[in-house]
Amino acid sequence: MGQTGKKSEKGPVCWRKRVKSEYMRLRQLKRFRRADEVKSMFSSNRQKILERTEILNQEWKQRRIQPVHILTSVSSLRGTRECSVTSDLDFPTQVIPLKTLNAVASVPIMYSWSPLQQNFMVEDETVLHNIPYMGDEVLDQDGTFIEELIKNYDGKVHGDRECGFINDEIFVELVNALGQYNDDDDDDDGDDPEEREEKQKDLEDHRDDKESRPPRKFPSDKIFEAISSMFPDKGTAEELKEKYKELTEQQLPGALPPECTPNIDGPNAKSVQREQSLHSFHTLFCRRCFKYDCFLHPFHATPNTYKRKNTETALDNKPCGPQCYQHLEGAKEFAAALTAERIKTPPKRPGGRRRGRLPNNSSRPSTPTINVLESKDTDSDREAGTETGGENNDKEEEEKKDETSSSSEANSRCQTPIKMKPNIEPPENVEWSGAEASMFRVLIGTYYDNFCAIARLIGTKTCRQVYEFRVKESSIIAPAPAEDVDTPPRKKKRKHRLWAAHCRKIQLKKDGSSNHVYNYQPCDHPRQPCDSSCPCVIAQNFCEKFCQCSSECQNRFPGCRCKAQCNTKQCPCYLAVRECDPDLCLTCGAADHWDSKNVSCKNCSIQRGSKKHLLLAPSDVAGWGIFIKDPVQKNEFISEYCGEIISQDEADRRGKVYDKYMCSFLFNLNNDFVVDATRKGNKIRFANHSVNPNCYAKVMMVNGDHRIGIFAKRAIQTGEELFFDYRYSQADALKYVGIEREMEIP
């Protein structure tokens, strides 16, 4: 028993020693390889330079160059001295004047920064990348500053640990190198020195052969446990095991991750569902700024579950040709049944109270099942339901459709797609490739029953073949999203009266805590009202167009109906410190063409980027300053204050360093985030502080995002330096900005 306990205690320690020794060997081997590559590249570049130099020397010898004729005597010129220039070639010595330049005042100190035209969200830095140099004076005054700074990062400094670096390449090599050890070798320390030397020689002899080919069996769990104990930041043993599987599988030619869908245009295209085909688009596409790989919104909004009330493109109901599917018996009724079912049958709400009244719940057909084999039972249930409880609703639909269809067509609208199948001509036996089937499922969610348009987009199938494929897949295609008909549309005047009362309630809530402004996140509770549990209501934010609630939600901002410039408190958007939304404010000019220079609405400058031309020059107050090139009027937009969007905790950590430098570009955006223009920003970052400024800053809500705008506090003339109030205390103002600008005499 004692021997077993000794082995169990010795095992993990022995594996840790192996991990450390193999890791150091691989690191040293990697350094040697890197040094050899550098030497070979240096020798190659040196040889190319010598060859090129020899060619240029030969060209210079063949050219006939005449020296520039210069006066032999320059002593008569004031402030100059003679300077002779000699050449190794057969050129005579030249005498030229040497002029002395007067001393020039140096420009103010400027730290490097990257220009930005919009905000850029970054993650928190949990590791101190470098210890900033504050100068000897700062360290003498506060010797514990560096220690406190490191404590803010939990003692994590980049490059501080000896074994802190391990990338994917070294990780795979380390696991493969440790795979040559056996589990029975835990008691190697008890062997004789001669036996250990023999084992070490055998390992070194076979190491190169084993590293050159993949391991025969999967590495032991002890290897990953030992690596996890040596590198705890890299994850647990299970996570390292999964990572090793992914890295080794990706090395195989043509191997794809298990969740990856083959290219729809490639030879290995598969027939997959619509959600799987569009997974990458839904994941990478930002529905708030309409960009892929958005760097401003880390949490992408989910696709809207509501369908547009008015389609942007009109549907063409005419047959596309003599072979069009509309000439088939029952085809028009089939398309009309799909349209009627989409309008009449909204999807079920997950819990929550209904806000709208349906015509008759018993007449609504059940949702199609996914299993194709059970489609017959589902169809019989649907038919029974429509025959017993749906007669009144069918009559109402027939009366509405009489203008565009015949009575025979209207009588067949209650039938389901599967029941329509025996009435049409025998379908063609056409094979659909995986790419064509996947493309059809993608397009059916956009064009619904417009099979002619789907056929034109697919390109390899006729509209009749598309129609027959749609009938075949009726039981597995998800129902189309319902139109937003939960609540009847109110009249505009009554809607705005209710909105005014709602704004007064919100304003009363915000009076007690006016400084609490929280970041907006779209609410995602479709088919449920925005009550006290809604995140927008909790944060005292208005619901935006990106929320999943109904368009008639009482917490939604409806926009304005102004006919003027929207620059007074008569405009609801201006009163709510928001810019006019081009999707909501349709009468003030905010929805005009984006390239239009003369826009009647003056409350959409930030989103349009209508900034003024700014000039950078040394300031009379402190360091650099920013100056206006063209005159601006009072309350006119000048520029947006852009930079990195960081959290409040990250701003506290950075602010301690900026305070020591006595230079800070931090600007509070809301209670959650701060704009830092130190590393990235635009030219307005050089605007200095003043207690008598000519500009003012205002945080506005612009299409769901808080953004900082700089506006003119008074009329500003050409060439004036821009100032705005940093809201410093009196002590901080004297510490950071020692000189106050002179007041202009009116």
From Swiss-Prot:
Residues 196-222, 374-385 have a biased composition (Basic and acidic residues). The modification Phosphoserine is found at S21, S76, S363, S366. One of its GO terms (molecular function) is transcription corepressor binding. It catalyses: L-lysyl(27)-[histone H3] + 3 S-adenosyl-L-methionine = N(6),N(6),N(6)-trimethyl-L-lysyl(27)-[histone H3] + 3 S-adenosyl-L-homocysteine + 3 H(+). Residues 39-68 are annotated as: Interaction with EED. It is found in: Nucleus. The modification Phosphothreonine is found at T339, T345, T367, T487. GO terms for cellular component: chromatin; chromatin silencing complex; chromosome; chromosome, telomeric region; ESC/E(Z) complex; nucleoplasm; nucleus; pericentric heterochromatin. GO terms for biological process: B cell differentiation; cardiac muscle hypertrophy in response to stress; cellular response to hydrogen peroxide; cellular response to trichostatin A; cerebellar cortex development; chromatin organization; DNA methylation-dependent constitutive heterochromatin formation; facultative heterochromatin formation. Gene3D superfamilies: 1.20.58.1880, SET domain (2.170.270.10). This is Histone-lysine N-methyltransferase EZH2. Residues 612-727 form the SET domain. Glycans are attached at S75. The keyword Cell division does not apply. InterPro entries: CXC_dom, EZH1/2-like, EZH1/2_MCSS, EZH1/EZH2, EZH2_SET, PRC2_HTH_1, Pre-SET_CXC, SANT/Myb. Its EC number is 2.1.1.356. Phosphorylated by AKT1. Phosphorylation by AKT1 reduces methyltransferase activity. Phosphorylation at Thr-345 by CDK1 and CDK2 promotes maintenance of H3K27me3 levels at EZH2-target loci, thus leading to epigenetic gene silencing. Sumoylated.
